[in-house]
A protein has these predicted regions:
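Catalytic core of membrane glycerolipid acyltransferases/transacylases, capturing the structured
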Residues: 1-50
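Soluble or luminal CAZymes and related metallo-dependent hydrolases
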Residues: 2, 51, 142, 146
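Non-catalytic C-terminal accessory region of glycerolipid acyltransferases
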Residues: 56-162
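Acidic, metal-coordinating catalytic cores used for nucleic-acid/nucleotide bond scission
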Residues: 28, 52, 77-79
């Protein structure tokens, strides 16, 4: 995703019919008023600096109970395919791991980088799909392949939107 309001745009696009549980970096949850509002909106925190077992367990709990978890595959904001540190962006394996372990589908979503305030943003929601793995729980290599496929699907949605 490319800016801070992407989760808000997506939550508004799907409406109340598809309540999403967004995952946000833990630093946001510690901001006095914002953190309270995010918690009330169903957002849960992830500590991005390490494998956050609590966030993973929370996401698994939500998915197994039929809720929808919103996370961005790159794990950070990206502009022009480059993260804020100047590195080429690549998908993390979190979405793949959660889908494999819970049996939940992955829904690719394209949100354009260029948005105008107080204007409609054309968000493209792809078809849900279930990633395939050979091993029972999936391996790191399988998760990486699934994450790469997810990014390919997102880019294909972006090409359709253009």
């Amino acid at each position: 995703h490319s800016c801070l309001n992407d989760p808000v745009c997506l939550v508004m696009a799907v409406g109340r019919k598809y309540q999403l549980r967004p995952m946000a970096k833990s630093e946001f949850m510690n901001i006095p008023v914002l953190g309270w509002l995010l918690k009330k909106a169903g957002v849960f925190a992830v500590d991005r600096g390490k494998s956050d077992v609590t966030a993973i367990k929370t996401a698994i709990k939500y998915l197994k109970s039929g809720e929808k978890v919103l996370l961005f595959p790159e794990g950070t904001r990206v502009k022009g395919g480059v993260d804020k540190h100047g590195h080429e962006s690549e998908a993390k394996s979190g979405a793949a791991m959660l889908a494999v372990r819970t049996g939940a589908p992955i829904v690719p979503v394209y949100i354009p980088e260029k948005k105008k305030w107080f204007r409609f943003t054309n968000i493209v929601i792809g078809e849900p799909y279930y990633p395939h793995v050979e091993s029972k729980k999936g391996t790191a290599e399988e998760y990486k392949e699934i994450a790469e496929e997810l990014m390919e699907r997102i880019h294909a949605l972006g090409a359709k939107a253009a």
